Amino acid sequence: MSVETIKAESHGLRSAVSIELQEPTPHFSDDVWQILKFHGIYQQHDRDVRGRNNRVYSFMVRSKLPGGRLTAQQYLIQDALADQFGQGDLRFTTRQGIQLHGVIKGNLQTTMKSLNDVLVTTLGACGDVSRNVMSCPAPYGDAVRTQLQETAEALA
């Protein structure tokens, strides 16, 4: 089935995500995996054990930060999640996003809720979408930078 067909039949990009989150498997089905991208999540497996009988799955969660801005609280929660549920580091992208690698399936809901609680979104951070609207996040107080940041946030 094509990605476009999967999206069209996904009930607003919900698909069976909530059902498969409750299943004890360490990964998602191929159809749900395609939908997860639009929620800012990539399913991955450890390449060092590729080809063996059992794949070791983990997930990358990418935050979408319009204009590259985030509060101290938003950064600190991502840093804490990296230590608690990830591989202990964060990766900053050229599109002004933050990637949290190494999250296992059983910790995805808590990770996503923690991000959402501090108003960090992952929606549209991955997949075949416009991933972010970038602008200079420097905290200068001139009118032009303020207008650019407001426009980036509105467009994102």
What residue ranges belong to the model's regions?
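Serine/threonine-rich low-complexity intrinsically disordered regions
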Residues: 2, 29-31, 107, 146
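Short glycine-/aliphatic-rich beta-strand segments at the starts of folded cytosolic domains
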Residues: 11, 17-26, 30-69, 131-139
